[in-house]
Amino acid sequence: MEMPGRRSNYTLLSQFSDDQVSVSVTGAPPPHYDSLSSENRSNHNSGNTGKAKAERGGFDWDPSGGGGGDHRLNNQPNRVGNNMYASSLGLQRQSSGSSFGESSLSGDYYMPTLSAAANEIESVGFPQDDGFRLGFGGGGGDLRIQMAADSAGGSSSGKSWAQQTEESYQLQLALALRLSSEATCADDPNFLDPVPDESALRTSPSSAETVSHRFWVNGCLSYYDKVPDGFYMMNGLDPYIWTLCIDLHESGRIPSIESLRAVDSGVDSSLEAIIVDRRSDPAFKELHNRVHDISCSCITTKEVVDQLAKLICNRMGGPVIMGEDELVPMWKECIDGLKEIFKVVVPIGSLSVGLCRHRALLFKVLADIIDLPCRIAKGCKYCNRDDAASCLVRFGLDREYLVDLVGKPGHLWEPDSLLNGPSSISISSPLRFPRPKPVEPAVDFRLLAKQYFSDSQSLNLVFDPASDDMGFSMFHRQYDNPGGENDALAENGGGSLPPSANMPPQNMMRASNQIEAAPMNAPPISQPVPNRANRELGLDGDDMDIPWCDLNIKEKIGAGSFGTVHRAEWHGSDVAVKILMEQDFHAERVNEFLREVAIMKRLRHPNIVLFMGAVTQPPNLSIVTEYLSRGSLYRLLHKSGAREQLDERRRLSMAYDVAKGMNYLHNRNPPIVHRDLKSPNLLVDKKYTVKVCDFGLSRLKASTFLSSKSAAGTPEWMAPEVLRDEPSNEKSDVYSFGVILWELATLQQPWGNLNPAQVVAAVGFKCKRLEIPRNLNPQVAAIIEGCWTNEPWKRPSFATIMDLLRPLIKSAVPPPNRSDL
C-alpha cells in the first residue's frame, strides 16, 4: 500500500486505552489491535457482516469505502477530516519517540501479511463496552475476528480490516504532519522528503519568528539555519503552556516581539527575551566588525574558532572552572539590571554575563556572519538545566567538534552521545505533555546515613587503641586516600566517608564491639585537643604559630581593607602585625584562614614580603611579616619631593621588582592570583626594593570594594572584569600592574578626580582608561596600554613584562651623586 509522494513507514495509531481491550486467544496469540472505527459503526448496515478477502493480487474493497480508484485518495469526511477523530484523541497518547505512543505496530504485535491467499478476514463487531476479541478459529492459518453482537439485539456494524488499517494510516499521517509542522515551523510542504536539497536550504529565507519558534520549542538550530535579524530567544515561558492557553490563530505559535516589549518586567521577573538586532544594537555591530577582523587575520578554521570562542567567553563573564553555577548569581544580577532599562526584551550585545545558552547563541550568530558551519544542540557539559545549549562546529564534511565556551574557551571536545543522540534530532512538539521530573524529598536520607556512619566510625577511631594519633587518624585516612574514592564522594556533595564505610558488615560490627574493650586513650579534659586544621596544615609544633602574648604591639603604621597594621617587637626583632578586622569567624572560615597562612608560609622570594608566622587563635587572628621601614609604595610616590628622590631608573627598577614578585606567584603550582594588587599593597625596604604583600588574603575578603573604608580597597587599580564582578584570572593582576606602572611613570594618583562609584562606571562599564602623557617614553606607554587591553587573554604575562622592562632599565642613566638614603 504505497502512497505516491508520501512516506509509507508510519505506524498505526491506537485510540483506545489498554484497559478497554480484551483478547481471547486460541493457539498462538497475536497481540492487541485497537480499532479506530468504533465511532463510525452507525455508518454501516446494522446486523450485516461485511467481508473482504485478501487475495495474492489485492483486496476486494467494501462498498462503503467508495468507488473505484485508489482507496487512500477517497474524500470521506468521516475519516481524517471528521472532528470526532480529533476530539477523541487525547494528548496523553503522544510520545517523543514516534508520532504516537503505544502504536499497534510497536511491541510484540505481528501484523498479518496482505499476501496470505487463504486467510479470510471477517468483519469486526463492537459490543457496548467498545471492546473486541481476537481469536483463531478453524484450522490452518485462518484469522477470524469474532463479532460480539449487541446483547439487546441492537445494530452492529462492521468494517474490513483493510479499511481500519487505511483509516489509521490516514489519521496518523495527518497528525504526524501537524505535529511536525508545529514543532519545526516548516514552510516547505515537502519537508518530509528523505533527501533535502542543501542549496535550497541555504537560499530559502526563514522569518525571524519562524526560527525563533523552532529554537524555542526544540532548543536546536542546524547548520543550515541562519539566525536572521530580529531573532529572539525566549526563556521563562513554557511552549506547552503557551499552546494550551492561547488561540494559535490569534496570538501565533510564539509571543510576538511587540507583545513582549509591552510586558512589564516587574510582573514576571523570570520572563526574558534576548534579541539579535543589528540595527539598534551598537555593541553587536562592534562584535560584527571584530568577527570580520578575526576571520581575516586567522589562517585555519581552528584558529577562527579559538579566537571567536575566547571573544564570546570574555565578553560574557569569562571562564568558570567549577561549573556554570558560578555564573548564575552574576547572571541574575546582570539581567535584573538590564530589565530596568530594556524591560523584557534585551539586546544580545548588552549582555556582560551569559550562561551557556546565551554564549551558544552568540557564537552561532557570529559564526553565520563569516560562514563558519555551526549548529546548536541541547545539553551542556557544565550544567544540567533543561535549557542548556552547546555549539558544534563542522570541520570538513565528516567531522564536528564541540566548542567549549564556558570552562576552557576555544577547546574542541569530541561530541558525546548526549549531543549526537536521538534527543538532539527528535521532534519535540509543544503539544506534548512535559516530561515529569522526580520529586526530591526535603530530607536527603542518603546524606543522613553517610553522616551517621561517619560519626559512628569517628568514635571508633578516637577510642581505638591502634590509633597512635589520638583521634586524628580518621582525618589523615580521609585526605590521604591514594585511591581517590573519597574524592568522588566529596564532589557529589556528600562529603568524605571514612574508610570503614566501605567495610563489610561483619568488620563494621567488629569495630563497633571494640569500643567496650578498648582502653580510654582520649586526652584528659584539662588538656586541649590539638586543632585539626593546625595538624593538617603543619602549623603546630613549629615557630609559625605565634602566641599573641609574645608580640609587643607598638604604633599603628597602616590600615587596609582587612584590618590594621602595627609595628611590633617579637623576640627582639621588628615585625609588622596585621590584625584582621573580622574576628568572628566560623570554624570553616578559620580553616580557610589557616590554609592561606600555609600558602604564605611556603613562599620564598626577594620580592615577596617574608611571612614569619600567624596568630591563629581568635580574637587575635593576625599575620606577622617582616617589617619594611619605608612603608608602602603608594605613600612613597605621592609624598612631596618624590620626583627628586625617585629618578626614572629607580622607578623602572621598582616596576621590575613588582613584575618579578608577581611572576613568581603566577608560576607557582597552583598559581597564586593576587586579586588586590595596588601600590598600597607594595612595601619598600631601606634599599628601595619593592616587595609584594597581602596576596594570600584576597579570598577571605567578604565585602565588596564599595564598602571599604580605606584607600586600600578602592577600585582605581582593579581590572574591568573585576569591577563588573565577573570571573577573573591572573590577567587581572596584569591590568593592576599597568596602573602601578602608570603611577610610577607619572607620579600621579590614579583617578584622583573621581570617587569610587565613578571609577567603577568609567572603567568597568564605559571602557575608560587613564590618560597617558604624550611626553612619556613610548616603550613604557606601550607596556601600559598592553596591560590595559579590555580582553584579558591579550594582556602580556609578567615574564614578558620583565623582558620589556630589562632593556629600559639598562638604557636609563642614573643621575650623579645619587645616594640610597
Curated annotation (Swiss-Prot):
Residues 35-49 have a biased composition (Polar residues). Residues 551-809 form the Protein kinase domain. SUPFAM superfamilies: Protein kinase-like (PK-like). The active site is at residue 676. One of its GO terms (molecular function) is protein serine/threonine kinase activity. ATP binds at residues 557-565, 578. It comes from the Eukaryota. Its EC number is 2.7.11.1. One of its GO terms (cellular component) is endoplasmic reticulum membrane. Expressed in both seedlings and adult plants. InterPro entries: EDR1/CTR1/ARMC3-like_pept-like (IPR055164), Kinase-like_dom_sf (IPR011009), Prot_kinase_dom (IPR000719), Protein_kinase_ATP_BS (IPR017441), Ser-Thr/Tyr_kinase_cat_dom (IPR001245), Ser/Thr_kinase_AS (IPR008271), Ser/Thr_Kinases-Pseudokinases (IPR051681). Disruption phenotype: Mutants display ethylene-treated phenotypes, resulting in plants with small, unexpanded leaves and whose seed cotyledon growth is impaired. It catalyses: L-seryl-[protein] + ATP = O-phospho-L-seryl-[protein] + ADP + H(+); L-threonyl-[protein] + ATP = O-phospho-L-threonyl-[protein] + ADP + H(+). SMART domains: S_TKc (SM00220). Pfam families: EDR1_CTR1_ARMC3_pept, PK_Tyr_Ser-Thr. GO terms for biological process: ethylene-activated signaling pathway; gibberellin biosynthetic process; negative regulation of ethylene-activated signaling pathway; protein autophosphorylation; regulation of post-embryonic root development; regulation of stem cell division; regulation of timing of transition from vegetative to reproductive phase; response to ethylene. Kinase activity is inhibited by C24:1-ceramide during hypoxia (e.g. submergences). Interacts with EIN2 (via C-terminus). This is Serine/threonine-protein kinase CTR1. It comes from Arabidopsis thaliana.
